Structure formats: structure tokens, C-alpha cells
From Swiss-Prot:
Subcellular location: Secreted
Source species taxonomy: Eukaryota, Metazoa, Chordata, Craniata, Vertebrata
The protein's role, per its UniProt record: Has antibacterial activity against the Gram-positive bacterium L.lactis (MIC=25 uM). Lacks antibacterial activity against the Gram-negative bacteria E.cloacae and E.coli, and against the Gram-positive bacteria B.cereus, E.faecalis, L.innocua, M.luteus, S.aureus, S.epidermidis and S.uberis. Does not inhibit the formation of NO by neuronal nitric oxide synthase.
Keywords, sorted A to Z: Amidation, Amphibian defense peptide, Antibiotic, Antimicrobial, Secreted
Species name: Crinia riparia
Protein name: Riparin-2.1
Domain of life assignment: Eukaryota
Keyword Transmembrane: no
Amino acid sequence: IIEKLVNTALGLLSGL
């Protein structure tokens, strides 16, 4: 898994 994807996913969840 690419860290960038993980960071993006976490960022979106935090944005919710």
C-alpha cells in the first residue's frame, strides 16, 4: 500500500 494513499484516506476521514 502506498503511504500517500493512506495519508489521503486519513486526511479525508479527519475532514469528515
